Amino acid sequence: MGRVEDRVRLEASWKEALHDEFEKPYMQELSDFLRREKAAGKEIYPPGSLIFNALDSTPLDQVKVVIIGQDPYHGPGQAHGLCFSVQPGVPVPPSLQNIFKELKRDLNIDIPKHGHLQRWAEQGVLLLNTSLTVERGNAGSHAGMGWQRFTDRVIEVVSQRREHVVFMLWGSHAQSKRRLIDSSKHLVLCSAHPSPLSAHRGFIGNGHFSRANQFLEQHGLTPIDWHLPEEP
């Protein structure tokens, strides 16, 4: 079958940084698992070419902000490899609606009509789910298959190789990754999750977007333009 790394299309800086990770047996097992699931007729999201979209869209040497999600969306046509983001033409999910509400409150940014966050990724916002695949209609179905180990390594690589990155950890799952981050050189921002179940327990009002830009500017870095284009 060949090595996993040889079969993965991945942006060059990440491929170099994660070379050793792709060589580990658990990544071969994960690859085999995904192939078996597809062979059994199961629908896996996002499509194969978009599994590593977060890394492809935001090269390692350009990472300024990391937002940590959990699972890809498990409905048809939603997931495209960026956490919280949906494909063009798909209704904006509730958690992302609350993210937009906080952006409006924090930076007076008009709430967009779509939920396609590619523009953020292209500016250096790594939109990283901790599991990179999911079975249709089955939330969390791939969480124990090795992805968390892989994405933990992604977080460690950013922490070790980059300077002055803002990590936004929303909810207990994301905050469990705090141990992977060197807070002496990075800014770690924690709050409740933007889900409708918890957004009003500390997500709305957290000011994370303005605080991120202040931190970037303090270190001579261009802030993120959180506006999204009218048309994705």
From Swiss-Prot:
It holds the Pfam family UDG. GO terms for molecular function: uracil DNA N-glycosylase activity. It is an enzyme of class 3 (hydrolase). Its main location: cytoplasm. GO terms for cellular component: cytoplasm. Coiled coil: none annotated. It comes from the Bacteria. It catalyses: Hydrolyzes single-stranded DNA or mismatched double-stranded DNA and polynucleotides, releasing free uracil. Keywords: Cytoplasm, DNA damage, DNA repair, Hydrolase. Its EC number is 3.2.2.27. The active site is at D71 (proton acceptor). SMART domains: UDG, UreE_C. InterPro entries: UDG_fam1 (IPR002043), Ura-DNA_Glyclase_AS (IPR018085), Uracil-DNA_glycosylase-like (IPR005122), Uracil-DNA_glycosylase-like_sf (IPR036895). One of its GO terms (biological process) is base-excision repair, AP site formation via deaminated base removal. The keyword Cell cycle does not apply. It is found in: Cytoplasm. Gene3D superfamilies: Uracil-DNA glycosylase-like domain. Excises uracil residues from the DNA which can arise as a result of misincorporation of dUMP residues by DNA polymerase or due to deamination of cytosine. PANTHER family: URACIL-DNA GLYCOSYLASE (PTHR11264:SF0). Belongs to the uracil-DNA glycosylase (UDG) superfamily. UNG family. HAMAP family: UDG. This is Uracil-DNA glycosylase. It comes from Azotobacter vinelandii (strain DJ / ATCC BAA-1303). The gene is ung.
